[in-house]
Amino acid sequence: MPKMKTKSGAKKRFRLTGTGKVIAGQAGKRHGMIKRTNKTIRNQRGTNILCESDGRIIRKSFLPNG
């Protein structure tokens, strides 16, 4: 059986922490910032740790090699 390949789109969008959690960029920051409050824009900076159920899907299907 051949090796499982990591999805190339997933390796650009997700990272794994040392404990195996999945880190992704914040959603909702591409356009339309003028209608958002300053608090919303500020809170959407940086990255976000995905919930356990979503992280399990990403690790199993898209990042088999970590």
Curated annotation (Swiss-Prot):
Biological process terms in GO annotation: translation
InterPro entries: Ribosomal_bL35, Ribosomal_bL35-like, Ribosomal_bL35_CS, Ribosomal_bL35_sf
Keyword Isomerase carried by entry: no
Pfam (any one): Ribosomal_L35p
Annotated Gene Ontology cellular component terms: cytosolic large ribosomal subunit
UniProtKB keywords: Ribonucleoprotein, Ribosomal protein
One GO molecular-function entry: structural constituent of ribosome
Keyword S-adenosyl-L-methionine attached: no
Superkingdom classification of source: Bacteria
NCBIfam families: rpmI_bact
Family, as annotated: Belongs to the bacterial ribosomal protein bL35 family.
PANTHER family for this protein: 54S RIBOSOMAL PROTEIN BL35M, LARGE RIBOSOMAL SUBUNIT PROTEIN BL35M
Protein name according to UniProt: Large ribosomal subunit protein bL35
Organism listed in the record: Azorhizobium caulinodans (strain ATCC 43989 / DSM 5975 / JCM 20966 / LMG 6465 / NBRC 14845 / NCIMB 13405 / ORS 571)
Lineage: Bacteria, Pseudomonadati, Pseudomonadota, Alphaproteobacteria, Hyphomicrobiales
